[in-house]
Amino acid sequence: MENIQLINIGFGNIVSANRVIAIVSPESAPIKRIITDARERGQLIDATYGRRTRAVIITDSSHVVLSAIQPETVAHRFVVNKETATINSN
């Protein structure tokens, strides 16, 4: 059975670390296009609570999650969570 790892993406919102493909900044035109396409498909999850989008999380199910915390912060939580899971499994 696979361990489910959860990552806090701000304001009490959590995503499954196992499903995350990329954590990117929302400024570039291609990422803005991905956000627009996800909104049209009904696969956009806005977890910003009305704040400015600072990180875009893309999942293996083609869902796009918007977060109000920096991509570096999300990535750091991802790495720390992964290291903790590795230590706990040994």
UniProtKB/Swiss-Prot annotation:
Top-level lineage group: Bacteria
A Pfam short name: RemA-like
InterPro entries in the cross-refs: RemA-like
Residues spanning the membrane: none
Family designation: Belongs to the RemA family.
NCBIfam families in UniProt: MtxBflmRegRemA (NF046064), PRK04323.1 (NF003315)
Matching PANTHER family: REGULATORY PROTEIN SSL2874-RELATED, REGULATORY PROTEIN TM_1690-RELATED
Name assigned to this protein: Putative regulatory protein cce_4590
Upper lineage: Bacteria, Bacillati, Cyanobacteriota, Cyanophyceae, Oscillatoriophycideae
